[in-house]
Amino acid sequence: MVKISFQPAVAGIKGDKADKASASASASAPAPTPAAEILLTPAREERPPYQRYKKGGSVGGVCYLSMGMVVLLMGLVFASVYIYRYFFLAQLARDNFFHCGVLYEDSLSSQAHTRMELEEDVKIYLEENYERINVPVPQFGGGDPADIIHDFQRGLTAYHDISLDKCYVIELNTTIVLPPRNFWELLMNVKRGTYLPQTYIIQEEMVVTEHVSDKEALGSFIYHLCSGKDTYRLRRRATRRRINKREAKNCNAIRHFENTFVVETLICGVV
């Protein structure tokens, strides 16, 4: 706050008279009134005028915001793909892969009521509608190790006898082989246990007929299984007959299961 004072001016008196008059006046007159004062409040500091953003800066901010949103969305997309690939597909693959076994009475053996055990690895492809089975070397004999494909799209079954390293193809027998969905449900129901309930075994006999040169016509699944291997077509015998020892030497057996029972596939006339 600034204080400004004004002193009153004296006019019309000259010389000594003026001095005496002023002295007497000052002696007789009452005390002088205080000088007039004006109080001034200091002016507020002026603020700089509002600075408007330039047009170029506004556009740049929008661009940075857009780029940030794009990066965020891309991160969400990649995270979703990662979760889908490494968690969902992995879980789906585990649900479609089975390592299982079955206990059965071997009625085909010369020894009566022989209890046997068969293990196999099963992969079921529901969307492609085919099954792939791997039969390892049996612990107690009774068959050859093999890879088997049941292609329900083509209506074909392929056996890869690992001991002979040869492929054999025949029409799919739907009375024995469960479709992928049904087989998957069966294995899921018994997944809590290691083995299926004790069951029995049946036998089917097949005969080699001709060599297959065009493997691509068999479909991509069987082609990849039999590529680079001698491949032959099979014909199923309509009537069962007892096989003597001489004929048995020319037959190879593969034991497997795609149902609630075990199947022994005899492939005779092996080249």
Swiss-Prot record:
Pfam families: BRICHOS (PF04089). It is found in: Lysosome membrane; Cell membrane. It is a single-pass type II membrane protein. The record marks R246, E247 as: Cleavage. One of its GO terms (biological process) is negative regulation of amyloid precursor protein biosynthetic process. The chain crosses the membrane at residues 59-79. GO terms for cellular component: Golgi apparatus; lysosomal membrane; lysosome; plasma membrane. Keywords: Cell membrane, Cleavage on pair of basic residues, Disulfide bond, Glycoprotein, Lysosome, Membrane, Phosphoprotein, Signal-anchor, Transmembrane, Transmembrane helix. GO terms for molecular function: amyloid-beta binding. Residues 140-234 form the BRICHOS domain. Disulfide bonds join C167-C226. The modification Phosphothreonine is found at T41. Glycans are attached at N173. It comes from the Eukaryota. The keyword Transmembrane applies. Type I membrane-bound, as well as soluble, furin has a pre-eminent role in ITM2C proteolytic processing. PCSK7 and PCSK5 may also be involved although to a lesser extent. The soluble form of PCSK7 is incapable of processing ITM2C. Fails to undergo shedding by ADAM10 and intramembrane cleavage by SPPL2B. InterPro entries: BRICHOS_dom, ITM2. The keyword Transmembrane helix applies. Belongs to the ITM2 family. Negative regulator of amyloid-beta peptide production. May inhibit the processing of APP by blocking its access to alpha- and beta-secretase. Binding to the beta-secretase-cleaved APP C-terminal fragment is negligible, suggesting that ITM2C is a poor gamma-secretase cleavage inhibitor. May play a role in TNF-induced cell death and neuronal differentiation. PANTHER family: INTEGRAL MEMBRANE PROTEIN 2C (PTHR10962:SF5), INTEGRAL TRANSMEMBRANE PROTEIN 2 (PTHR10962). Interacts with BACE1. Interacts with APP. Interacts with STMN2. This is Integral membrane protein 2C. It comes from Bos taurus (Bovine). The gene is ITM2C.
